Amino acid sequence: MAFVKDMLRMWAHSWKRFISIAMITLLGVAVLTGIYAGCRDAFRSTDRFFDAQGLHDVQVLSTAGLSNGDIAALRKVNGVAKVQAERPQEVTFDLDGRKSATMQEIGTNGIDQPYLQEGRMPKKAGEIAVTRKFIRDSDKRIGSRLTVTPESASSDTSDTNDTNGADGTNETNGTDEAPSFPTKLTIVGVVLDPQNLSNPDGYSAMTSFRSTATTDYTFFAPSDGVTGTLYTSATLLVKGAAAESTFDESYENTVKQVTDRIDGTVKTDRQKARRQELLDAGNKKIADARAEADKKFADAQSQIDANRQQFNQQVDQIVSMQAGAAAAGAAANGANAGAAAAAGATTLQLDETTRETMRETIIAASPELTQAKQQLDQAQSQLNEQKASTEHTLKTKENELKTSIPQVRWYVQDRQSLGGFSALKSDLDSIQSLGNAFPIVFLLVAVMMSLTAMARMVEEDRSLIGTYVGLGYGRLAVASRYLLFALLACLIGGGLGLIAGFLGIPAFLLVVLQGMYVMPGLRLEYDWLYGSLGIALFVVGVLAATIYACVQEMRQTPAALMRPKAPRAGSRILLERIRPVWNRIGFLGKVTARNIFRFKSRLIMTVGGVAGCTALIVCGLAINDTVADLGIKQYRDIYQYDLMVVSDDSDALAMRTKVASDGRVTSSLDVRIESGDLTVAGSGDGDSGKAGSSGSESIQLVAVPEKHLSDLGEMVTLQPVSSGILGTSGVGKTGSLKLDDDGVIVAQSAASALGVKAGSKVRLTNGDGVQATAKVSAVNRNLIGSDVYVSETYYAKLFDSKDAKNTKNSKSSEDSEALTWNAMLAKLSGSDTSQTDYAESLEEDSSVMKAVSCAHMADSFKFDLMGAVVALIVALAGGLALVVLFTLANTNVSERVREMATLKVLGFFDREVHHYVNREMMILTVMGVILGLPLGRLVGGMLTMALNMPSLYFEVEVKPLSYVIAAVATMAFALLVQLFVNPVLDRIDPISSLKSVE
């Protein structure tokens, strides 16, 4: 009992050490669990939402549309739970200039169901539900009416129907109808599209370069009132996928098994069958056209023959009348009846032989008959020409049919192809990667501080330990005094850390996340396993340090332990050998210098602890500086143009004419811009089209006219990149790249994420969904977005081959050779404000789809989630620095109580004692700061390079001010700790302290 009371008394006396260990454990466990828990809560809530709304696991698209046979074949694939055929329609409407929307049918199979936020779901024709983004951008509300106009080419495959005459959806007659929605609409509800969780009312600008939407808005309508049998895609749910977390590898493996089956069995057969359907439909159309033409020609020929017969009868009548009159005259003048009969016979005989001559004479003598004969001959000639021309045309179409219908391509995509899904996943993954790295530093510092604190605690009880061992107490029992002390401190600190880690930090992160994404049903959850492991990790580390400290002392005999420990012997230091410097240092300065290097363990612990905390602060500030400079570097340094304007192909000429003629435009470059995908060649079958796989990146494909290739360098800084461990890729690299016809130039952001370099082979998917293998000629410096530059000639080489032509663009060779330059890069005069205003005014023009001002993008770009995490990390690192300095300062004082007492006996004033002790701590702190600044730069560079976020490349930037802030903050913490330590020095009793050894 006395042993226990003494142990509790010792614990109460060492409350400062207890608080230090508990605080370090609290911070470490909070960092270890907090960022993880915040990301996990977001992952789980989003996964539950996706399962509830039936977000598709797989999407199948085809360059020739999907038929009922395709849908039936997909349903038979092993592992497919549900299949839903999609038939959207693109429409336009007037909202501050022309805006576009996708009319989406609310499926009946429970796939991709919108989440109702206000009002009710549409039930009958003419009712729609809209997204909150549309409500925000317009003055519409529930009950408002809207009129839309279908686009002329709203579907990729509707043109296929016009060109080839069939889509194959109706296999009995080979005819299709493009989707058609009501145009007079009434808003009855506000919904959230599960395919896009971006918060329209949020404060993030990330959507400016991550959005993959081809229209401005999405409207949801019921099946009532929707007509058409043309399917543009099919969405699938996979059996067992809902039971897995959509963000886990197990989910990806489950879905991959189904996509592999589709690729390996259904796709090839249905691609061939679909093309054959189109060929059969085309041949049937030609056969029907020939039959119809033959019928019309036969009718026309019958009409001509009837008219000619009537004409001949009229002429024959005239001939007969003239012949009869001649015979009658001869009979009247004849001598006898025999002579008359002979004359009649002769006349008839002459009529048979000279009938044609007489016909021609009669026709020639009559203008009416002449005109009638000419009309008949002309009609016959025209009919013959039409028959020959039609037959030639049909023969040509028969010969061209096989070449005009390309090979059908299926593209099998998973959820990664959804821009909103991939953006959320990449954001959370990047934050989680930071959360996995920083706790390591906290754990190392916790072990170091625990070793320092517990070693001093054991050393202070050295004589007491010897007494207990001498009295017969086992070494384990004696060591339990300190092990239980450390364990209790860890458990209390860890428990508080779990509260902060599973409640405080996640709540903070989720508030920031909800400013970027809409995540219904978000709730905080506790993970017993991870929480227990988090505490256990720090308990093991701290107890290991405590055991080491106990073993170091208890290996001695009780008699040796009960005697005072001999003071550490002094030694000459390097500075003493530099006589000119050493001789000019005062006495106290020399004592300080010797003390610093005399206690090497304290030197290592202090410098290491301070360096670690400083490095964490620098690392956090480095990430903040890197993100803060992304917009400026991209939109003011890399992009030399001031304005990018994009239009539909049909409005391209009008847009270019309008912009080029404006006086504010000083120079411009016509280009073609398409949204596409970049996939590492060899990561999968080129035909599989898995644009959403881990080896894929959404890109902006920029085609440049052949005659203006040299002008691209004036609009975009094409700078080759280099990379290093510090993440300074592209910095200091000289020279510029030239776009040629031998390959494409890939943006650094995409190249870094995919591991692509110059000479690599990649699979490019253009705006029409056509894939081709391309060579990477160079990688250019690019931080935001993923641009791929290609020359006009190389673009044609990639996508205009027979196998690459999309059915949508199945045109004559003359039409397919030229690209439509649907975008313009322009340099503007005037201030940033005037350039932004000009871009906004252009967006109101009906010929402009999008106008982007680089000045506006540079000023408005921000990455709020990363900024919030950086602020959290810096705050926690600052707290850790404060605890570390407090622990080291108290340990330093407890080690040197007799030394301080001696100074007081010698007549030192309190202020001089403060200065004597604090000077050593400040010097050690400065040494730790000097070591921590470059260490933080190194760690920050390694962490930011490891993020690999889609459409972003972190070119590490640490501003001088950040180094100053980190150094000043650490020094400020050191000064703050001194304010707490100085009263302790004042309370030292010289007499009792000097007699403590006795």
Identify the residue ranges that each predicted region occupies.
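N-terminal Sec/SRP start-transfer signal
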Residues: 1-30, 483, 571-612, 892, ...
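Small-residue-rich transmembrane alpha-helices
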Residues: 451-456, 461-463, 487-519, 528-555, ...
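C-terminal transmembrane helical bundles of large multi-pass transporters
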Residues: 808, 822-824, 841-949, 953-962, ...
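Short, strongly hydrophobic transmembrane alpha-helices
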Residues: 15-41, 57-59, 487, 601-626, ...
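Membrane transport/envelope proteins' first extracytoplasmic loop
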Residues: 3-444, 456, 630, 634-643, ...
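Short cytosolic juxtamembrane segments of multi-pass membrane proteins
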Residues: 555-573, 983-998
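Interfacial "coupling" helices/loops that link adjacent transmembrane helices in transporter permeases
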Residues: 6, 14, 448-487, 884-925
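Juxtamembrane segments of multi-pass membrane proteins
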Residues: 587-741, 748, 760
